[in-house]
Amino acid sequence: SQLPVMEGDHIVGIVDESDVLLHVYGDENRFRDPVATAMVSKLDKVAMGAPIEALLPVFDRGHVAIVMDGERFVGLITRIDLLNFLRRRVQ
């Protein structure tokens, strides 16, 4: 699961379990480090009104789509989220 890292009202990164585990591996004192030291700050932003196909290049890169309404963070979409959405549409 990915979590947004916010600075005020702005998304500045995302972090997931593997980011945290890789950051603290071998030194449990690193659990005290700021979240920003473990986050991914290169974000693939997609406009809220973009077609679903705009997600495909993001997922092809193995990234998470950061959904934006202008400059406002709305949410994030993972490949699994898209697969679950498509599965529900078929049922």
Task: State what each model feature region is.
Residues 27, 35-37, 56-57:
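Short secondary-structure boundary/capping segments
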Residues 6-7, 24, 44-62, 68-69, ...:
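The conserved cystathionine-beta-synthase
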Residues 21-26, 31:
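Cyclic nucleotide-binding regulatory module and flanking cytosolic helices
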Residues 3-19, 59, 67-81:
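A glycine-centered beta-loop-beta connector
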Residues 21, 36-39, 83:
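Conserved protein kinase catalytic domain
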Residues 31-43:
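Bateman (tandem CBS) regulatory domains
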